[in-house]
Amino acid sequence: MASQSRRRRPLRRPETMVPGEAAETDSELSASSEEEELYLGPSGPTRGRPTGLRVAGEAAETDSDTEPEPKAAPRDLPPLVVQRETAGETWGEEETPAPAPALSLLQLRLAESQARLDHDVAAAVSGVYRRAGRDVAALAGRLAAAQAAGLAAAHSVRLARGDLCALAERLDIVAGCRLLPDIRGVPGTEPEQDPGPRA
């Protein structure tokens, strides 16, 4: 046992001071190495120290590592209803509208001026529309009269054309008729011949 601990004792390292870390002495290094050798050594367990036992597999969780599993709420419970009541809330009261602020004299004058302006603008616009409507109606009447005169003139021209066509047909009938005698061959109607000078 002593020979094994002597063979496994690490070599003494030079002491170096590193800022931010604590320096270990040789006594502390030797004590920690001996504890590791006694705990992990091949010899049997010593008195007064816990022995290490290696088991293949995962390490078991301790009591401090166990976490309580969340439990689902039972489904037969009714849904939770939250009722909120505000302090000072009274039921059955009707909210009355706030009274309108009193209008000043300037605001009244402005309202009257605005009403007069609206009335004048509406009257002017309606007058313009009425005059335009009368002018459009007069133009429509004149257009209707001109249309009637044009229709009458077209009817007169159509009648005159019909009369002229009838007269032309009658003249053609008279010119082409053979029932009338030829007045050029009637005896006694021939012109007298001049006998000439006598000797």
From Swiss-Prot:
Residues 1-11 have a biased composition (Basic residues). Phosphorylated. It holds the Pfam family BLOC1S3. It comes from the Eukaryota. Residues 39-54 have a biased composition (Low complexity). It is found in: Cytoplasm. Keywords: Cytoplasm, Phosphoprotein. InterPro entries: BLOC-1_complex_su-3. Residues 1-81 are annotated as: Disordered. The modification Phosphothreonine is found at T62. Residues 23-38 have a biased composition (Acidic residues). The modification Phosphoserine is found at S64. GO terms for biological process: anterograde axonal transport; anterograde synaptic vesicle transport; endosome to melanosome transport; melanosome transport; neuron projection development. The keyword Cytoplasm applies. Component of the BLOC-1 complex, a complex that is required for normal biogenesis of lysosome-related organelles (LRO), such as platelet dense granules and melanosomes. In concert with the AP-3 complex, the BLOC-1 complex is required to target membrane protein cargos into vesicles assembled at cell bodies for delivery into neurites and nerve terminals. The BLOC-1 complex, in association with SNARE proteins, is also proposed to be involved in neurite extension. Plays a role in intracellular vesicle trafficking. Belongs to the BLOC1S3 family. This is Biogenesis of lysosome-related organelles complex 1 subunit 3. It comes from Sus scrofa. The gene is BLOC1S3.
